[in-house]
Amino acid sequence: MPRMSLVLLWLCLCNSAWALSSARLDTPDVRLSLGPHMSYLEDPRGNLSLQDVQNTPSERFQAVNHDHVNLGKNTSVWWFRVELDNRLAETLPGFLEINYPLLDHLQLYLQTPDGRVSQQESGDRFAFTQRPVQVRNFWFPLQLPSGNSHLLIRVDTTSTVFLPVFFSTYGASAQAQENLMAWNGAFYGMLFAMVFYNLFLFLSLREATYFWYVAYGLNVGLLGACFDGMLFKLLPDYTALQGVSIYILLFTQTLAAAQFSRHFLHTKDFFPRLDAGLRLAMLVILALLLSGLLLDLQLWGALASLTLLSTSLALLLVGVFMWRQGVRYGSYYTLAWSVLLTAFAIVTAGSLGFELLGLYGATTIKLGVTIELITLSIGLANRINILKDEGFNSRRAAEQANLANQAKGRFLAT
């Protein structure tokens, strides 16, 4: 038994040593995730100074042991620590990338081997022009001398404490961004192609369903731009709007989705009570949106995420119900919302600190939205064909009835 205890203690010490090992930088072109090399300290009251954190024993820091940090939504301030080991003989220039654009306030402290400490700060509370590097995420330029440099990051935010942190040299960073830009270009290109196609159909057919598809698609685009940090870049000086825009868009997303669903599924014509329930739900969502004037921002943000998730689940159940009642294009609607609900569930759980399948971030939402919008557009086309067939069958039945009446009239006349 004593031997087993010693083995377990040795394994724990080895794991701790591995978790807090320095980030080794031994090539002039590198992009390295710092999550596995980071540890963190919670500051519940937010009153610890830099000196307090530097003097804190290592045992009080917890190892991240993941590719990135996700501590969910909370009211604490967090300190993250990592040691950067430049094995090269010369200074290594690059960026510290924190690729999550919804963080409120970041303070970065770098202590070089000669003991000097430099400070930088950023966050969505600052105007875009005040960022150390004017990109959509939070990047900090670093010059790492040969040897060990110690990095501390202070995070104070009302959003999810999510930090995908990388050290990247200039060339490696440009290469990674080029690949990401290709994916983003494909997503936004598809999105606006679907929006303009359905806008053309709305202008041609004057059908309200297409209008609400366009409204829903535009809201998706704005939400994606906000989640990506592009909205901050387009509106660089509106710092007050930056802090609340994503929550406003989450609520308007649910409103647009509910209104589109009412028109797509013809709930008013087929199931008036269900339609009344959807309208009541929209009034509740509107009230929750306006409650942001009274509630704490962090509570309101969590409420927005839960509202989106619960509304998506409710709309999925509406689609299943309509499909089972014989509305044929309800199958497309159900498939679309099944995919999107899965994406929303993953992201909402991630925003609360529980990562499902190890996924969180804009990519999950974009993939779900892409499949959903394409499926709904196909469903709209199928819906048109069904309505045309129903109209043709109605006209044919009317013509046959008219012919029968004429024949009956001639028979009676004779």
Language-model region placement:
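Bacterial N-terminal signal peptides
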Residues: S5-S16
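Soluble non-transmembrane domains of integral membrane proteins
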Residues: L20-M181
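Carboxylate/His-rich catalytic cores and anion/metal-binding grooves
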Residues: L102-Y109, F211-Y213, L218, L222-A225
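First transmembrane helix
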Residues: V165, A174-S204, A302-W323
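Juxtamembrane interface at the cytosolic side of transmembrane helices
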Residues: M194-N219, T267
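Interfacial "cap-and-anchor" motif at the non-cytosolic start of specific transmembrane alpha-helices
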Residues: L222-H263, T267-A397
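Primarily the dimerization/phosphotransfer
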Residues: N393-T414
